[in-house]
Swiss-Prot record:
Residues that, per the record, bind Mg(2+) 1: H130
Keyword check for Metal-binding: yes
Pathway named in the protein's UniProt entry: Metabolic intermediate biosynthesis; 5-phospho-alpha-D-ribose 1-diphosphate biosynthesis; 5-phospho-alpha-D-ribose 1-diphosphate from D-ribose 5-phosphate (route I): step 1/1
SUPFAM superfamilies the UniProt entry points to: PRTase-like (SSF53271)
Lineage of origin: Bacteria, Pseudomonadati, Campylobacterota, Epsilonproteobacteria, Campylobacterales
Function: Involved in the biosynthesis of the central metabolite phospho-alpha-D-ribosyl-1-pyrophosphate (PRPP) via the transfer of pyrophosphoryl group from ATP to 1-hydroxyl of ribose-5-phosphate (Rib-5-P).
EC number: 2.7.6.1
The species this protein was found in: Helicobacter hepaticus (strain ATCC 51449 / 3B1)
Active-site residues from the entry: K192
InterPro entries: PRib_PP_synth_CS, Pribosyltran_N, PRibTrfase_dom, PRTase-like, Rib-P_diPkinase, Rib-P_diPkinase_bac
Binding locations of Mg(2+) 2: D169
Name of the protein in question: Ribose-phosphate pyrophosphokinase
Length: 309
């Protein structure tokens, strides 16, 4: 194995420590402070000369701070003689701004890709990009893992009598179909009409859910409006139970309250983002072992293809 070190930003140190533990190493030392005006100051606490470096930093809220911290850490490591710098970004912020949908708006996902690449990062390891084409915004290797691998294993522990996979909207059909095909289930679609940003209105169910145990799947749960309204409609159409699988628990604004009041029986997420508070309906699955295995294989010059579910 090549000599490597793992550093953690401040976004999710619990996750970083879990990844390091899976690899039987300790996180390398770094100090992250702020100047009196709020600017971020980073100091690397040990030699990295000639080493392969992995920085673990999801760019979740506050996205601007965590992204800037990642870039500054990268610059510090590059100037300290690191050989290769790999950014492990379990949740890739700004991924929803991947194209122009109205005039005179930015493509921020491309801008962020440019910033990451120009900072000196040689490889990005992420999971469930909101838009997979973002991989093409980079001219460096991007490994986009899938949370569905841990969801599949979790579903094996459930005793569903008549399960079926559902996409909460038309945009997620490809993701839901891929998951349904891999686990051998049929697919239904919840069609919705979006009234305004972060608000959704469920309109119709395409498929039969009467007496079924419905498994909603999406890449993220933000305000939870889509998932909760979908669950309510599915139950009204005769669904026996409804659980939601969402890789990234953004859970902003009224999300937790909506989940509590909704017809959702369970919400299953990963620890790609730190959960704000515990919630009786929310189950968190760890993807730290998955990321640790990717790091191990990269350091051994092994293929990571089998880890893409």
């Amino acid at each position: 194995m090549r000599g490597f070190k793992i550093f953690s930003g401040s976004a999710h140190t619990l996750f970083s420590n879990e990844v390091a533990k899976c690899l039987d190493i300790s996180l390398s030392k770094t100090t992250i402070n702020r100047f009196s005006d709020g600017e971020i100051n980073v100091q690397i606490g040990e030699s990295v000369r000639g080493k392969d470096i992995f920085i673990i930093q999801p760019t979740c809220a506050p996205a601007n701070d965590h992204l800037m911290e990642l870039l500054i850490m990268t610059d510090a490591l590059k100037r300290s003689g690191a050989k290769n710098i790999n950014a492990v970004i379990p949740y890739f912020g700004y991924a929803r701004q991947d194209r122009k949908v109205v005039p005179r708006v930015p493509i921020t996902a491309k801008l962020v890709a440019n910033l990451i690449e120009q900072s000196g990062i040689h490889r990005v390891i992420t999971m469930d990009l909101h838009a997979e084409q973002i991989q093409g915004f980079f001219d460096i290797p991007v490994d986009n893992l899938y949370g569905s691998i841990v969801f599949r294993d979790y579903l094996k522990t459930k005793s569903f009598k008549n399960p079926i996979v559902a996409s909460p909207d038309i945009g997620g059909v490809a993701r839901a179909r891929h998951f349904a095909d891999r686990i051998g289930m049929d697919l239904v679609i919840v069609d919705k009409k979006r009234e305004r940003a972060n608000e959704s209105e469920v309109m119709n169910i395409i498929g039969d859910v009467d007496g079924k145990d419905v498994i909603l799947i999406d890449d993220m749960i933000d305000t939870a409006g889509t998932m909760c309204k979908a669950a309510d409609v599915l139950k009204s159409r005769g669904a026996n139970s409804v659980i939601a699988l969402g890789t990234h628990p953004v859970l902003s604004g009224p999300a937790l309250e909506r989940i509590a009041k909704s017809a959702l029986d369970e919400v299953v997420v990963t620890n790609s983002i730190p959960l704000r508070v515990a919630h009786p309906k929310i189950k968190v699955l760890s993807v730290a072992p998955l990321f640790a295995e990717v790091i191990r294989r990269i350091c051994h010059n092994e293929s990571v293809n089998s880890l893409f579910f």
